[in-house]
């Protein structure tokens, strides 16, 4: 029996162990199923957030008896014909927060400005050009820097402001060591600092109010404890924003703290010293100060720098039918969408949600979500619709236009089968792929399949900062800047909003979203399907935003369909019609949505920019002899030169441009370049060139501008120009402003490229001097080997080519050519090195006098750049001084 127990006991222990392991395994599997269920099941909805209510519900009337409105005092406008519409901003440093906030608002409003470090003794910048004022408004980041100017600078600035009707905006930021109470030096105005305030209100009597709507009292504390309020008995000061002290301040001494009305912003009407000012007792971190600041700029500039009251908003809902289960819209969500749209139409005329669809994903949600899809289609006539891609694929991944067009046709067929109206002429690419950087196949397919006239993107010229986003037109399609609103595919629950729900509310109530509408006349907002299911944050956001805007501003909100909206945009900003192409490889986001079949290695490393008739073709020829240097392919339409940056070719895009260059075998050692001699004197080329090729080297060749003018005239005669054939050179260069148009056109092409200093200054505005090589064309003609040595060193080309052995002077041609075996040479075409009669003395004397000042400015410029003046320039200046 004992032996049997010894055998059975281990067996029973083994079964017990197995049972325990089985229970543990079952528990783990159960927990796994539970975790999967919890993660994939829809979350239990908390009560949906309610949008902002009517203005009338936001607090009671302000403290004290209401003041009757005061008739606005007459405003002295700036001398509009005598001042430039430019704001002069004095900042504490290039990195000060308030200074950056001031500049950001000016940039967002598209106002021109100039920043200067707040001057020390005698450092006031030049304020006038002869009798013309340079600035229409002066802003001081630190008011005390203005108040404490030395007597000479203060008198200079104040006299300028009085004479030209220029106003001043100043900010007073209290510090820890600031006096709690003090009189502002030289003004009948007292400051009380380092206060905690609450319950703010706009004074309806303030004359500067334009965008700002006078409000009822808004209860609640103002951020921070470093506020400054203003007190004065002088009639020149009118409160703009008013607050009251916090209860904790009641026990503090001083009669001002027991007053109910404490101005944080005051308007100086100019009755004290003839200068109008607006003074802020805090920075711009408080949202209402930003709003009043915009009004102050408008008022003090006589509305020369003023934002119109009209605002156009379009709300796109991307990814209709797209989205994983549990995040899509259901029937109740669609009903809420319709209800909110109708409510918004009472506040924003013609407001309509704009729905972008990808038909492939129709009915791919849960049963409830599929019913939501059907509900959207049932009410399809209530919305506007635009196409995404059929399968939500990014267009830049399609390298074949026909395949891309086939995807679009699938989406179009889906729309036809379900009765979706698609006649808006608008489309949006998933992830904005192919819109910018340009994917030409997308634009062509859009036009052929859908007849698209308008699209939008957040990527031009870059995503951040948003205030720099702009529109452009390419291939007949208008591209509008698209704005984000803080809602993305993953932001679907109010209490899980990144940074907390207060972050979303802060954006709506005076933050980024509010400022987007305030500072942009046209806003196209990107939202997503998932923002209208779940907690319906899209509905909450835009209803709250519209109501808040109507509470605090006088903006006239309205909606237009995409095509008239785009037409309106380019009426307002015609200068944006032409794009500014940039290097896609300089922006990671751009590179991610750019075809992998394209490479920035095909962009040139240097440009030969001219001017014409100075020897640039010879340099092009000599450089092409170098094994590490490769020129662009010749253009069949523009005299072999590409002429991309200065003409209609620019609008064909960078794909067209790069097709003129081979893919280098070694991008680090191979040098691609192009020569277009018309670039030098073009007003647009330096900016365009620097945008696309910011690191490119620039080579220019200068000869005596009189000789260049004569050479161009002879060039035109050789090509049969009837004006050059029928007029002498002297008649051309001395023609009056009343001369025939074609004669004056030839005159300009002879003379204007010779304004060397003017054109070089333009290039130096966009390129650092270290990237610009100014060659002596006369030296190039006499000693090309030495000139080519300079160029090779400038470019950093290896291996170094000895042009003394490579080039040979051709006696018959009268020019330097490539030396070949057997004493032969290979030279430029017969049109180069052409001989013609010497210039007549009358023309020579005329041009010497005509170019005297231009040559003098060139000499000064070369001296500043540390470059020696060429021999021809020294000779010209000597002759001019002798004459």
Curated annotation (Swiss-Prot):
Q: Name one GO biological process term.
A: heparin proteoglycan biosynthetic process
Q: Where in the cell is it found?
A: Golgi apparatus membrane
Which residues does the entry place in the Lumenal compartment? 40-883
What does a knockout show? Mice are viable and fertile but have fewer connective-tissue-type mast cells; mast cells that remain having an altered morphology and severely reduced amounts of stored histamine and mast cell proteases.
What is the first-listed, main subcellular location in coarse terms?
A: Golgi
An example Gene Ontology CC term for this record: Golgi apparatus
Disordered as annotated region, ranges: 49-82
Bilayer topology annotation: Single-pass type II membrane protein
Alphabetical list of InterPro entries matching this protein: Heparan_SO4_deacetylase_dom, HSNSD_N, NST/OST, P-loop_NTPase, Sulfotransferase_dom
Q: What else is known?
A: The presence of 4 different heparan sulfate N-deacetylase/N-sulfotransferase enzymes in mammals, as well as differences in their enzyme activity suggest that some initiate heparan sulfate modification/sulfation reactions, whereas other later on fill in or extend already modified heparan sulfate sequences.
The protein depicted here goes by the name Bifunctional heparan sulfate N-deacetylase/N-sulfotransferase 2
Provide the organism lineage as a comma list: Eukaryota, Metazoa, Chordata, Craniata, Vertebrata
